[in-house]
Amino acid sequence: MIPTDTAPPSKPAQGHKGYKNRRRLSRELALQGIYQWRLAGGNAQEIDLQLQQVNFYSKADGSYFSDLLQGVLEHSRDLEAQIQAYLDRQLAELSPVECSILLIGTYEMVHHPEIPCRAIINEAIELAKSYGGTDGHKYVNGVLDKLAAQLRAVELQSSPVRNKDPH
């Protein structure tokens, strides 16, 4: 598990309501589980059952959490290969937190096309800001942006460019 000094809050974050908040909590739980798996091993079912005991589990989207945890663990080799292509170092040299966040974001891009890639990247950045190193969110953003250009090229081409002056 993530050490208690970096564990997710026991209450949902304020400012987000309903569905989005439930998904964010699901990602936080998945981050804990994947972090634990990367450091100590174990199987998805055991980790899933253990994290169901976390006091804010009932506020999360349990099925989405299970999908993220089990999906990342099941497809970890493929996800790691996709991520490695965009890293400036070996995956093993990344912090376990940032590596886990990249695995979640990559899994969502590949297996959840219904979620806009910008939302996936933004959620990963928020996780990295909360649980990663000082500039970890910048690194996560850079890697996922490059992955999105490959995995979601059509989506990115069809979305309007923000902050562009039409004149």
UniProtKB/Swiss-Prot annotation:
GO terms for cellular component: cytosol. One of its GO terms (biological process) is DNA-templated transcription termination. Keywords: RNA-binding, Transcription, Transcription antitermination, Transcription regulation. It comes from the Bacteria. Gene3D superfamilies: NusB-like. The keyword Transcription applies. InterPro entries: NusB-like_sf, NusB_fam, NusB_RsmB_TIM44. Residues 1-21 are annotated as: Disordered. GO terms for molecular function: RNA binding. Involved in transcription antitermination. Required for transcription of ribosomal RNA (rRNA) genes. Binds specifically to the boxA antiterminator sequence of the ribosomal RNA (rrn) operons. Belongs to the NusB family. HAMAP family: NusB. This is Transcription antitermination protein NusB. It comes from Nitrosomonas eutropha (strain DSM 101675 / C91 / Nm57). The gene is nusB.
